[in-house]
Amino acid sequence: MLNFRALFLLILFLAVPLLADRSQSEQMVNRAWEAWDRGDKGEVLPLFEKAIAADSTNTRALLGLSLWYELHEQYKPAWGLFRRFLHQEKNPYPYLFATWTTPKMAVPDKKEMGVFPVWMDLVDHPDPTGTLQAMAFQELGDFYQRRGMLDSSRYYYEQTRALEDWTVCGPFDNISASGFERIFPPEGKYDFQKTYPGQSGVPAKWHKISAIRSDGWIDFRRYYAYDNAVYFGNTFVYSPRKQRAEIRVGTSGSLKVFLNDELILEYFDENNNDLDTYVVTADLQKGWNRLLIKCGYSEITQCNFMARVTDGQGQALEGIRYSSEPQKYSAKPGAEPRVRPNFAEQYFEEQIRLFPDQLENYVLLAHCYLRNDKAIEGELTLREAIRRAPGNPLLYQNIVEAYSRGEKFDEIATTMERLYDIDENLPFAIRFQYNRLMESEQFDRGEELLNRLREIVPGTAELAAEEIGFYSAKRDVPKIIESTETAYREFPDNWQIAATRAMISIQTTRAYGEAVEIYQKYLEKNYTINALSTLAETYLKASAVDL
């Protein structure tokens, strides 16, 4: 007969050391963050490592050490630790969203670093909202396009299910963003044949666009040459029945969304953001529904949007179809719109409420805000974190991005000085000081900082490009040529370095043959518009020269 008392005691005996290890590990994580704030640079890394050794499943330890490596621009270990974190974290999706555009996920060779499998896992196992899956489709489209595998690229872009059949109209006046509140004729009845008075008297009428960007974004700059303007996109959505649907939009520019002539979403700030940034649940009527997008820009340089119509999980609705052709629809039937907050922002806001002393949540919430250009929200979040830990360099480096997006240049300079005072060996802080010295042509002091970068982050394409820039600033032609040739041998797939090497070849040989070969070699692995256009321009310049 099984002795339940003995079994219970055995389980208790085995569990006590495990609980002790977890408690000890958590204590070391807290000590690591405290040391980070105090400036005990030599203690932070060992404490995180000891915490992981004590409990390899401690997600705070894995995440904290990943952030430490990323701050020091050691992206391979940063990404490796973050992948381990994802495997241990019960709800990894908010963390993936927050980290998506950070340097450790933006490394050039995403297959080697293991980012590629994360995308494929999202393709096969969508996140609850479907937003990360759509982002993975976009990344895979980009990945294959850069390699010239256009059929694969097109396939993954199409899986995003972005609406592609639109008519567009513009430009309309938007001086000092005044067009956001103005009601322009396209906001009324849709009339494809009508011509309206547009910006500066330019006739504005609806046009059916014959081609869009391969990634599914409707880019007004590709159809119009006018800045400081408001533009419209119009399409019709057919639903086999009345049903709730999510209208998901990402933009560069201010935004208003109308469904069946009813305003269901508006955002005044001109932000550069990602797909699904704005999500509103509304009623699609049975039959055809008019969807109108109003975008404006006056402070930024881009104006575009992507729209998706999905269910609550970000998946395609059955029986839905789209057409830019004029359709009969019921105007203002009552959409009952309800804006859905960003899931990752909500998650980290709740984590901060529950654990106000865990600084990583402030950093990740700021990442969520800043990746969608919410500069003020990101700044306020990081200010609170700095109030709690005024000596932590991670917080200062992140708030610089908030200041940059908010164009607060004085705050950037002050914060960078503070960051350099806290840790003069941070690559980010060194580069800021180095660039200031280069602007004032203090080359000797600048070279000292460049040498420090060589010691801290050796063997990177960024450092090689900085060395070329250093000799260019000094107008040291032999060194420019020498450093460029060295850099190109090591980093032929870096566009800045490859283009510089080609330019030097043209200048020194007065011929284009080698430059063409450099561009062609680059394009073998990096099929980009920039490289293609440069190669085409080189062919034109060399048209009278025997290549």
What are these model-predicted stretches?
Residues 259-306:
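Beta-strand-rich ligand-recognition modules
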Residues 23-50, 54, 327-380, 401, ...:
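Alpha-helical segment of the N-proximal tetratricopeptide repeat
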Residues 22, 56, 90-91, 131, ...:
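Short coil turns that delineate tetratricopeptide repeat
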Residues 239, 244-257, 291:
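Aromatic-lined ligand-binding clefts that engage carbohydrates, nucleic acids, or primary amines
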Residues 30, 64, 97-101, 139, ...:
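Canonical tetratricopeptide repeat
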Residues 101-214, 295-361, 366, 371-373:
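Accessory carbohydrate-binding/adhesion or oligomerization-edge regions at the termini
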Residues 26, 60, 93-97, 135, ...:
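Start-of-helix register in tetratricopeptide repeats
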